[in-house]
Amino acid sequence: MKKIYWVSRHAPLLSQINELKRIFKEDVELIIDPEPFSSAKEIAERYKRSGCSDLVVVAPLSVLQKLVEEEGLHPLYAVMIETKEGAEVEVKGKYYRFSCFKRVKGVKLELEDIQPP
């Protein structure tokens, strides 16, 4: 059985659990951690202590970037499509349906200073 550490304040959807089973071709045990985190380093430490072999993280892009670049982790990312049709979840008046998981290999943030008009 594949053990996966799930870092999100949102519980996994049935469609997400089924997709993980399909991807890994075995049953999965999710260790769900809904607790807030202060940094990518804290997520990495909690994941390593969990004994899990994979990781799903719902976090800001800057945190995902640090997980990859500073902690050497490549978490799974749940792709959600904003749509009312077939929606599985509603958050603050917006509707979403799970699409697939992708592995985070890198995150590139391009930022520029804001110039006054």
What does each of the following model-derived ranges do?
Residues 1-54, 65-117:
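Long, low-complexity, Lys/Arg-enriched
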Residues 60-62:
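Short beta->alpha connector loops
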Residues 57:
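Active-site-adjacent beta-strand anchor residues
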